[in-house]
Regions:
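Bacterial N-terminal signal peptides
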Residues: 8-16
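Short, solvent-exposed loop/beta-turn-alpha elements that line the ligand-binding surface or hinge
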Residues: 110-137
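N-terminal secretory/targeting leader peptides
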Residues: 12, 23-115, 142-372
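Sec/Tat signal peptide C-region and signal peptidase I cleavage site
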Residues: 16-22
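Bacterial N-terminal signal peptides that target proteins for export
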Residues: 1-8
Protein backbone atom coordinates (compact mmCIF):
# COMPACT_ATOMS: atom_id res chain seq x y z
CA UNK A 1 0.00 0.00 0.00
CA UNK A 2 2.80 2.37 0.93
CA UNK A 3 4.56 1.57 -2.34
CA UNK A 4 1.36 2.27 -4.26
CA UNK A 5 0.96 5.66 -2.58
CA UNK A 6 4.63 6.46 -3.16
CA UNK A 7 4.47 5.51 -6.84
CA UNK A 8 1.25 7.45 -7.24
CA UNK A 9 2.86 10.51 -5.66
CA UNK A 10 5.88 10.28 -7.95
CA UNK A 11 3.66 9.94 -11.02
CA UNK A 12 1.57 12.92 -9.92
CA UNK A 13 4.66 15.09 -9.37
CA UNK A 14 6.04 13.96 -12.72
CA UNK A 15 2.82 14.88 -14.50
CA UNK A 16 2.73 18.28 -12.82
CA UNK A 17 6.34 18.93 -13.83
CA UNK A 18 5.57 17.87 -17.40
CA UNK A 19 2.58 20.19 -17.48
CA UNK A 20 4.72 23.10 -16.26
CA UNK A 21 7.28 22.39 -18.98
CA UNK A 22 4.53 22.12 -21.59
CA UNK A 23 3.14 25.50 -20.55
CA UNK A 24 6.53 27.22 -20.86
CA UNK A 25 6.81 29.09 -24.16
CA UNK A 26 10.27 29.88 -25.45
CA UNK A 27 10.83 32.94 -27.65
CA UNK A 28 14.07 32.77 -29.63
CA UNK A 29 15.29 36.30 -30.40
CA UNK A 30 17.84 37.06 -33.14
CA UNK A 31 19.86 40.25 -33.53
CA UNK A 32 22.88 41.19 -35.59
CA UNK A 33 23.87 43.89 -33.06
CA UNK A 34 27.34 43.27 -31.64
CA UNK A 35 27.47 41.79 -28.12
CA UNK A 36 28.75 45.09 -26.67
CA UNK A 37 25.97 47.17 -28.25
CA UNK A 38 24.20 49.50 -25.81
CA UNK A 39 20.74 48.21 -26.75
CA UNK A 40 21.48 44.66 -25.57
CA UNK A 41 21.28 45.39 -21.80
CA UNK A 42 17.90 47.07 -22.33
CA UNK A 43 16.66 44.04 -24.25
CA UNK A 44 17.87 41.74 -21.48
CA UNK A 45 15.98 43.86 -18.93
CA UNK A 46 12.89 43.58 -21.12
CA UNK A 47 13.22 39.80 -21.40
CA UNK A 48 13.62 39.43 -17.62
CA UNK A 49 10.64 41.70 -16.90
CA UNK A 50 8.36 39.69 -19.21
CA UNK A 51 9.58 36.40 -17.76
CA UNK A 52 8.90 37.67 -14.24
CA UNK A 53 5.43 39.00 -15.07
CA UNK A 54 4.45 35.68 -16.64
CA UNK A 55 5.86 33.62 -13.74
CA UNK A 56 8.23 32.00 -16.20
CA UNK A 57 5.62 30.83 -18.69
CA UNK A 58 7.55 32.86 -21.28
CA UNK A 59 11.30 32.30 -21.57
CA UNK A 60 13.59 34.19 -23.93
CA UNK A 61 16.64 32.79 -25.70
CA UNK A 62 18.70 35.65 -27.12
CA UNK A 63 21.25 35.37 -29.95
CA UNK A 64 23.18 38.58 -30.71
CA UNK A 65 26.08 39.47 -32.97
CA UNK A 66 24.58 37.59 -35.91
CA UNK A 67 25.32 34.29 -34.14
CA UNK A 68 21.99 32.81 -35.30
CA UNK A 69 21.05 35.00 -38.28
CA UNK A 70 22.74 37.90 -40.07
CA UNK A 71 21.04 41.28 -40.41
CA UNK A 72 19.91 40.40 -43.93
CA UNK A 73 18.64 36.97 -42.89
CA UNK A 74 16.66 37.88 -39.77
CA UNK A 75 13.30 38.77 -41.42
CA UNK A 76 13.27 35.56 -43.45
CA UNK A 77 14.53 33.58 -40.49
CA UNK A 78 11.68 34.79 -38.29
CA UNK A 79 9.19 34.09 -41.09
CA UNK A 80 10.48 30.54 -41.48
CA UNK A 81 10.70 29.79 -37.76
CA UNK A 82 14.48 29.76 -37.35
CA UNK A 83 13.84 32.47 -34.75
CA UNK A 84 10.60 33.65 -33.17
CA UNK A 85 11.52 37.32 -32.87
CA UNK A 86 14.18 39.62 -34.20
CA UNK A 87 15.73 42.96 -35.01
CA UNK A 88 14.69 43.87 -38.59
CA UNK A 89 16.41 46.30 -40.97
CA UNK A 90 14.44 46.58 -44.20
CA UNK A 91 17.15 48.57 -45.96
CA UNK A 92 19.30 45.44 -46.07
CA UNK A 93 16.65 43.69 -48.17
CA UNK A 94 15.02 46.64 -50.00
CA UNK A 95 13.30 44.58 -52.68
CA UNK A 96 11.62 42.43 -50.02
CA UNK A 97 10.76 45.26 -47.61
CA UNK A 98 10.12 48.31 -49.83
CA UNK A 99 7.82 50.05 -47.31
CA UNK A 100 10.36 49.81 -44.52
CA UNK A 101 13.05 50.98 -46.92
CA UNK A 102 10.83 53.89 -47.99
CA UNK A 103 10.36 55.03 -44.38
CA UNK A 104 14.14 54.92 -43.98
CA UNK A 105 14.38 57.59 -46.69
CA UNK A 106 12.95 60.07 -44.15
CA UNK A 107 15.93 59.60 -41.82
CA UNK A 108 17.48 62.87 -42.95
CA UNK A 109 14.60 64.73 -41.27
CA UNK A 110 15.08 62.97 -37.93
CA UNK A 111 16.57 65.84 -35.94
CA UNK A 112 14.68 64.94 -32.73
CA UNK A 113 15.02 61.24 -31.87
CA UNK A 114 12.45 61.36 -29.04
CA UNK A 115 9.87 62.85 -31.40
CA UNK A 116 10.69 60.46 -34.22
CA UNK A 117 10.65 57.40 -31.95
CA UNK A 118 7.04 58.20 -31.11
CA UNK A 119 6.30 58.85 -34.78
CA UNK A 120 7.88 55.59 -35.94
CA UNK A 121 6.02 53.37 -33.48
CA UNK A 122 2.62 55.00 -33.93
CA UNK A 123 3.02 54.93 -37.71
CA UNK A 124 4.02 51.27 -37.91
CA UNK A 125 1.45 50.00 -35.43
CA UNK A 126 -1.65 52.04 -36.25
CA UNK A 127 -1.35 54.51 -39.12
CA UNK A 128 0.27 52.61 -41.99
CA UNK A 129 -1.73 49.69 -43.42
CA UNK A 130 1.01 49.07 -45.98
CA UNK A 131 3.52 48.67 -43.14
CA UNK A 132 1.34 46.09 -41.40
CA UNK A 133 0.85 44.19 -44.66
CA UNK A 134 4.59 44.12 -45.32
CA UNK A 135 5.32 42.57 -41.94
CA UNK A 136 2.47 40.10 -42.50
CA UNK A 137 4.33 38.87 -45.59
CA UNK A 138 7.08 37.87 -43.19
CA UNK A 139 4.51 36.21 -40.93
CA UNK A 140 5.47 38.81 -38.33
CA UNK A 141 3.89 41.38 -36.05
CA UNK A 142 5.84 44.62 -35.61
CA UNK A 143 5.92 45.56 -31.93
CA UNK A 144 8.55 48.22 -31.15
CA UNK A 145 11.52 50.24 -32.28
CA UNK A 146 13.36 53.51 -31.71
CA UNK A 147 14.75 56.26 -33.93
CA UNK A 148 18.49 56.61 -33.68
CA UNK A 149 20.38 59.70 -32.61
CA UNK A 150 21.83 61.66 -35.55
CA UNK A 151 24.12 59.83 -37.91
CA UNK A 152 27.54 61.36 -38.50
CA UNK A 153 30.52 60.44 -40.65
CA UNK A 154 33.38 58.50 -39.02
CA UNK A 155 36.35 58.91 -41.37
CA UNK A 156 39.88 57.58 -41.65
CA UNK A 157 41.20 61.02 -42.58
CA UNK A 158 40.04 64.55 -41.86
CA UNK A 159 37.42 65.68 -44.39
CA UNK A 160 35.79 69.09 -44.19
CA UNK A 161 34.38 70.35 -47.48
CA UNK A 162 32.14 68.71 -50.08
CA UNK A 163 35.17 68.69 -52.36
CA UNK A 164 36.99 66.47 -49.86
CA UNK A 165 34.30 63.80 -50.26
CA UNK A 166 34.67 63.42 -54.01
CA UNK A 167 35.55 59.82 -54.82
CA UNK A 168 35.55 58.73 -51.19
CA UNK A 169 33.84 55.44 -50.38
CA UNK A 170 31.30 56.01 -47.62
CA UNK A 171 28.65 53.85 -46.01
CA UNK A 172 25.37 54.83 -47.64
CA UNK A 173 22.01 53.13 -47.12
CA UNK A 174 18.56 54.46 -48.08
CA UNK A 175 18.62 58.28 -48.29
CA UNK A 176 22.23 58.33 -47.18
CA UNK A 177 23.24 56.63 -50.40
CA UNK A 178 21.72 59.49 -52.37
CA UNK A 179 23.36 62.04 -50.07
CA UNK A 180 26.73 60.38 -50.66
CA UNK A 181 26.24 60.67 -54.42
CA UNK A 182 25.27 64.34 -54.06
CA UNK A 183 28.55 64.92 -52.22
CA UNK A 184 30.44 63.19 -55.02
CA UNK A 185 31.23 60.16 -52.85
CA UNK A 186 30.67 56.49 -53.66
CA UNK A 187 27.96 54.89 -51.46
CA UNK A 188 28.65 51.39 -50.15
CA UNK A 189 25.71 49.42 -48.71
CA UNK A 190 27.13 47.52 -45.74
CA UNK A 191 25.65 46.86 -42.32
CA UNK A 192 26.92 48.93 -39.35
CA UNK A 193 28.92 45.99 -38.01
CA UNK A 194 30.38 45.14 -41.43
CA UNK A 195 31.49 48.78 -41.68
CA UNK A 196 34.20 48.32 -39.06
CA UNK A 197 35.92 45.59 -41.07
CA UNK A 198 35.39 47.62 -44.25
CA UNK A 199 37.15 50.58 -42.62
CA UNK A 200 39.95 48.40 -41.33
CA UNK A 201 40.52 46.77 -44.75
CA UNK A 202 40.37 50.05 -46.67
CA UNK A 203 37.07 49.26 -48.39
CA UNK A 204 35.46 52.29 -46.72
CA UNK A 205 36.89 55.75 -46.18
CA UNK A 206 34.00 56.79 -43.92
CA UNK A 207 31.46 54.84 -41.92
CA UNK A 208 28.07 56.30 -41.08
CA UNK A 209 26.36 55.92 -37.72
CA UNK A 210 25.72 57.73 -34.44
CA UNK A 211 28.62 59.05 -32.37
CA UNK A 212 28.17 56.08 -30.04
CA UNK A 213 29.42 53.75 -32.80
CA UNK A 214 32.99 54.82 -31.98
CA UNK A 215 32.56 52.46 -29.03
CA UNK A 216 29.52 50.27 -29.75
CA UNK A 217 30.74 49.21 -33.19
CA UNK A 218 34.49 49.76 -32.63
CA UNK A 219 34.75 52.49 -35.27
CA UNK A 220 37.15 54.35 -32.97
CA UNK A 221 39.78 51.71 -33.70
CA UNK A 222 39.79 52.47 -37.42
CA UNK A 223 38.29 55.96 -37.91
CA UNK A 224 39.71 58.80 -35.83
CA UNK A 225 37.88 61.73 -37.46
CA UNK A 226 34.20 62.27 -36.63
CA UNK A 227 32.27 65.08 -38.33
CA UNK A 228 29.63 66.26 -35.85
CA UNK A 229 27.37 67.96 -38.40
CA UNK A 230 24.16 65.92 -37.91
CA UNK A 231 22.70 63.95 -40.81
CA UNK A 232 19.49 62.77 -39.13
CA UNK A 233 19.01 59.51 -37.25
CA UNK A 234 18.19 56.27 -39.06
CA UNK A 235 14.51 55.22 -39.09
CA UNK A 236 14.70 51.96 -41.00
CA UNK A 237 15.07 49.44 -38.18
CA UNK A 238 12.68 47.70 -35.80
CA UNK A 239 13.90 46.31 -32.52
CA UNK A 240 11.31 43.73 -31.53
CA UNK A 241 9.09 41.86 -33.97
CA UNK A 242 7.34 38.58 -33.22
CA UNK A 243 6.29 35.74 -35.52
CA UNK A 244 2.49 35.71 -35.73
CA UNK A 245 2.13 32.02 -34.78
CA UNK A 246 4.15 32.67 -31.64
CA UNK A 247 2.05 35.75 -30.78
CA UNK A 248 -1.14 33.74 -31.29
CA UNK A 249 0.18 30.89 -29.12
CA UNK A 250 0.43 33.25 -26.14
CA UNK A 251 -2.44 33.86 -23.76
CA UNK A 252 -3.95 37.36 -23.53
CA UNK A 253 -2.13 37.86 -20.22
CA UNK A 254 1.19 36.81 -21.77
CA UNK A 255 0.70 39.19 -24.69
CA UNK A 256 -0.18 41.95 -22.22
CA UNK A 257 3.02 41.25 -20.29
CA UNK A 258 5.00 41.88 -23.48
CA UNK A 259 3.21 45.11 -24.41
CA UNK A 260 3.36 46.36 -20.80
CA UNK A 261 7.16 46.47 -20.95
CA UNK A 262 7.58 47.82 -24.49
CA UNK A 263 7.57 51.49 -23.31
CA UNK A 264 10.53 50.82 -21.01
CA UNK A 265 12.34 48.89 -23.75
CA UNK A 266 11.99 51.74 -26.23
CA UNK A 267 12.69 54.49 -23.69
CA UNK A 268 15.74 52.71 -22.34
CA UNK A 269 17.16 52.19 -25.82
CA UNK A 270 16.82 55.77 -27.04
CA UNK A 271 17.94 57.37 -23.76
CA UNK A 272 20.95 55.03 -23.74
CA UNK A 273 21.88 56.27 -27.20
CA UNK A 274 21.54 59.93 -26.19
CA UNK A 275 23.70 59.46 -23.08
CA UNK A 276 26.23 57.26 -24.88
CA UNK A 277 26.81 59.84 -27.61
CA UNK A 278 27.90 62.36 -24.98
CA UNK A 279 30.00 59.89 -23.00
CA UNK A 280 31.77 58.64 -26.12
CA UNK A 281 32.70 62.15 -27.23
CA UNK A 282 34.34 62.78 -23.87
CA UNK A 283 36.17 59.46 -23.57
CA UNK A 284 37.27 59.04 -27.18
CA UNK A 285 38.45 62.62 -27.61
CA UNK A 286 40.90 61.85 -24.80
CA UNK A 287 42.14 58.76 -26.64
CA UNK A 288 42.83 60.41 -29.98
CA UNK A 289 39.58 60.74 -31.93
CA UNK A 290 38.92 64.22 -33.30
CA UNK A 291 35.28 65.35 -33.07
CA UNK A 292 34.70 68.47 -35.12
CA UNK A 293 32.31 70.45 -37.27
CA UNK A 294 33.14 70.48 -40.95
CA UNK A 295 33.53 73.58 -43.06
CA UNK A 296 30.21 75.50 -43.32
CA UNK A 297 30.08 74.54 -46.99
CA UNK A 298 29.50 70.92 -45.94
CA UNK A 299 26.43 71.75 -43.84
CA UNK A 300 25.18 74.00 -46.64
CA UNK A 301 25.52 71.16 -49.15
CA UNK A 302 23.58 68.80 -46.88
CA UNK A 303 20.77 71.33 -46.38
CA UNK A 304 20.61 72.02 -50.12
CA UNK A 305 20.29 68.30 -50.76
CA UNK A 306 17.52 67.91 -48.17
CA UNK A 307 15.56 70.86 -49.57
CA UNK A 308 15.19 69.22 -52.94
CA UNK A 309 15.03 65.63 -51.78
CA UNK A 310 11.58 65.32 -50.18
CA UNK A 311 9.78 65.37 -53.52
CA UNK A 312 12.29 62.87 -54.88
CA UNK A 313 11.64 60.59 -51.90
CA UNK A 314 7.93 60.39 -52.69
CA UNK A 315 8.64 59.65 -56.36
CA UNK A 316 11.20 57.09 -55.27
CA UNK A 317 8.58 55.46 -53.05
CA UNK A 318 6.29 54.94 -56.02
CA UNK A 319 9.12 53.36 -58.00
CA UNK A 320 9.83 51.05 -55.04
CA UNK A 321 6.30 49.72 -55.20
CA UNK A 322 4.77 51.73 -52.34
CA UNK A 323 1.06 52.09 -53.14
CA UNK A 324 0.56 55.51 -51.55
CA UNK A 325 3.90 57.14 -50.70
CA UNK A 326 2.29 60.57 -50.36
CA UNK A 327 -0.07 59.29 -47.65
CA UNK A 328 2.83 57.88 -45.62
CA UNK A 329 4.76 61.15 -46.02
CA UNK A 330 1.74 63.17 -44.88
CA UNK A 331 1.18 60.86 -41.91
CA UNK A 332 4.81 61.23 -40.83
CA UNK A 333 4.45 65.03 -40.92
CA UNK A 334 1.20 64.88 -38.93
CA UNK A 335 2.71 62.61 -36.30
CA UNK A 336 5.81 64.80 -36.01
CA UNK A 337 3.51 67.69 -35.11
CA UNK A 338 1.62 65.54 -32.60
CA UNK A 339 4.69 64.19 -30.81
CA UNK A 340 6.52 67.51 -30.76
CA UNK A 341 3.48 69.06 -29.08
CA UNK A 342 3.14 66.17 -26.61
CA UNK A 343 6.75 66.50 -25.51
CA UNK A 344 6.62 70.30 -25.35
CA UNK A 345 3.53 70.13 -23.12
CA UNK A 346 4.52 67.18 -20.91
CA UNK A 347 8.32 67.17 -20.79
CA UNK A 348 11.14 65.05 -22.11
CA UNK A 349 12.34 63.24 -18.99
CA UNK A 350 12.62 59.46 -19.08
CA UNK A 351 9.61 58.68 -16.87
CA UNK A 352 7.30 61.05 -18.74
CA UNK A 353 8.46 59.73 -22.08
CA UNK A 354 7.76 56.11 -21.15
CA UNK A 355 4.29 57.10 -19.91
CA UNK A 356 3.49 58.91 -23.16
CA UNK A 357 4.63 55.93 -25.22
CA UNK A 358 2.37 53.68 -23.18
CA UNK A 359 -0.67 55.96 -23.22
CA UNK A 360 -0.45 56.96 -26.87
CA UNK A 361 0.81 53.74 -28.44
CA UNK A 362 1.57 50.50 -26.66
CA UNK A 363 -1.52 50.31 -24.42
CA UNK A 364 -3.58 50.36 -27.63
CA UNK A 365 -2.18 47.07 -28.97
CA UNK A 366 -4.86 44.38 -29.01
CA UNK A 367 -3.67 41.64 -26.67
CA UNK A 368 -7.05 39.95 -26.22
CA UNK A 369 -7.49 38.51 -29.68
CA UNK A 370 -5.21 36.43 -31.90
CA UNK A 371 -4.21 37.79 -35.30
CA UNK A 372 -6.44 36.31 -37.99
Amino acid sequence: MKNTVLIGGILCASLLASAAVAQEKKIVYASYLSPQHITNPVLEDFFRAVEKDTDGSIKFESHVGGSLLSGRDIPGGVRDGVADAGYFVGSYIPSEMPIDNYIAQFSLWNSEPLVMTGVLNELELFDCPECVDEYRKFNTKYLASYALTPYVYHCKEELSTPEDFKGKRVRGVAAYGDLAKALGAVPINVSPDEAYEALDRGILDCALHSVAAQKARSYGEAAKFVILDPLGGFLGASTFNLRIEKWNSLTPDERAAITKHLPDLVTGAIFNYIAEDEDVKKVYSESGTKFYNADPSFAAAVEEFKAGYREQVIKKGASMGVKDPQAISDTIDRLIGKWRKLLDENGRDKETYARLLNDEIFSRIDTQNPIE
